[in-house]
Amino acid sequence: MRMRLVLAFVSLLTTTGLAQTPPQDNQTVKVGPWTVATTYEADKFNHCTMSSSAEDLGISFVRDQDELSLVLDSSKWKLERGKAYSVRLVAGSQSIEAKALAQAKSVTIALTDRPFNGKLRIANALEVRGEGATLHVPLVGSAAALERLEACFDKNERESTETNPFVAPSRKP
């Protein structure tokens, strides 16, 4: 009797602990040279990332509820934290002006132009042209990886949305 009670208690603790942790399946997936990962903060979905590297350049595309962003980092950089550097992004025959927001060793570039983002899916490379240099960002295999990034975001955003089962959902056009 005592053994059954102990086993039941251990089972309850294990089940409760598993129910409180975010889902562990498919949190990191390799898609060609890219790694697509899910990030949680305080047990809530935060964003999905698609990462790779080329020489000393770290490359990450981050998809959160607001936008798609490109994060570039290098241990060789010495940037002015908080500064917004003007850059020109070139993918194939299309280019746009953007701002690269700096940290000490990285920059974040918001990718808000939908037609340009579509071009990223089919381009072999992205050029990030700054005043001092042009960075060559290889995009080999990025079409499939970007699709997986969007699927990661859609799936986790849908699953993390808090709902009230006792009221009708709001209808939005």
What are these regions (language model features)?
Residues 1-5:
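Positively charged n-region of N-terminal signal peptides that target proteins for export
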Residues 6-15:
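Bacterial N-terminal signal peptides
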